[in-house]
Amino acid sequence: MVLMVVVFLLLLFWENELTEDVVLTSIEQLHVDYPQNAVPLRYCNYMILQRVIREPDHRCRKVHVFIHERPQKINRVCTSSKKMSCPNDSDLFCFQSETKFRMTVCQLIDGTTYPACRYQISPIKGFVLVTCDDLGPVDLQGYVE
């Protein structure tokens, strides 16, 4: 009986670990900051470090975008009638938002390397382009100003 409880707890812990990894790489974790964090200075540097955003080979990401809209509003992009080939990958279909979203574009400052990545901040309004699956947005493919 004790062994069954231990096995159950191990399986439960393992399942939570797998689920946690999926959540950490979701579009919401990577790109959504709503309401916008009130970091007075160095917003991009803080957010990218806080969320551990980097390239797979651990280099600084050259450009990263944070969207300052409710997750529900971003989810609705997947029902947009504006469906098109993604600009970066013509094999994928993208959905474009029907309205412009508030965003912050973080552009890597030349000469900075991981983990001391430094970014220039550009607040913009633009239409987002996302890929979707049955559950909603999967990845931010870009934006159109």
Swiss-Prot record:
Keyword Secreted set for record: yes
| Keyword line | Secreted, Signal
Q: Where does this one sit in the cell? A: Secreted
Answer yes or no on keyword Transport.
Answer: no
MF (Gene Ontology)? nucleic acid binding
- Disulphide bond pairs: none
Where is the signal peptide, in residue numbers? 1-19
One Pfam family it belongs to: RnaseA
Highest taxon above the source species: Eukaryota
User: Which Gene Ontology cellular component terms are annotated?
Assistant: extracellular region
InterPro entries per UniProt: RNaseA (IPR001427), RNaseA-like_dom_sf (IPR036816), RNaseA_domain (IPR023412)
Q: What does this protein do?
A: Does not exhibit any ribonuclease activity.
The similarity annotation says: Belongs to the pancreatic ribonuclease family.
The protein here is known as Probable inactive ribonuclease-like protein 12
Organism the protein comes from: Mus musculus
